[in-house]
A protein has these predicted regions:
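Short acidic/polar hinge/loop motifs at secondary-structure boundaries
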Residues: 1-24
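Face-selective signature of the C-terminal outer-membrane beta-barrel domain
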Residues: 122-138, 155-187
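Residues that define the transmembrane beta-barrel architecture of outer-membrane proteins
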Residues: 34-36, 66-70, 111-113, 160-166
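Extracytoplasmic
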Residues: 4, 15-17, 35-39, 51, ...
């Protein structure tokens, strides 16, 4: 829906998500001082086996306005499963859509590209180093008179994001796997 764009949920390609963790309440403040009501952790996929996938969809919004979405992902894992990498990408191009013909878009124009990877290296039978990175480039524009600069229109809704993020994590397990030490850094 258009509401997902407001909250930026469309910025995260579904083909890179393994699971979503939701933590409610004050205990989530462990993730930062602003997380007093809760957090949502999106866990990206880890490579398990060699694979590749390409998908493309073309949807016509209202039967006339195109929404193109292309996703690519691949994973490579060594034969001994001590190292692996998962690569993902998405490109999406959606035209603006004016449902009621009043000159104002109900769905804004969208140009988005996402690229990233998650890799691991098992440094021993009881330890693992994980590194991940992603880049999200997204431009959204809605309102009216979309061919004019934003300051020359009656109403403009516009965002332009360049997001780089990543993380480095080290896991150390006890020999009986009952205990784990986890050290991580995210940006």
């Amino acid at each position: 829906s258009a509401l997902t764009g407001v909250y930026g949920l469309e910025q995260i390609p579904a083909n890179m998500i393994e699971r979503v963790e939701v933590m409610r309440g004050g205990g989530s403040a462990l993730f930062g001082s602003s997380a007093i009501a809760g957090t949502i952790n999106i866990i990206t996929k880890e490579p398990m086996r060699n694979s590749a996938q390409i998908a493309h969809s073309l949807t016509m919004i209202g039967g006339s306005r195109p929404d193109n979405n292309t996703t690519v992902n691949a994973s490579l894992v060594t034969d001994d499963h001590k190292a692996g990498i998962y690569l993902f990408g998405q490109g999406r191009h959606r035209a603006s859509y004016d449902h009621d013909g009043d000159g104002y878009s109900e769905l804004g124009k969208l140009e988005a590209k996402t690229l990233g990877f998650r890799s691991y290296l098992k440094t021993s039978n009881y330890s693992k180093l994980t590194f991940e990175y992603h880049n999200i480039s997204e431009f959204r524009r809605g309102g009216n008179l979309l061919d004019l600069p934003p300051h020359e229109t009656d109403i403009t809704e516009q965002t332009d994001h360049q997001i780089n993020g990543g993380g480095l994590k080290f896991d150390l397990f006890s020999r009986d796997y009952h205990h784990r030490l986890n050290v991580y850094r995210r940006r």
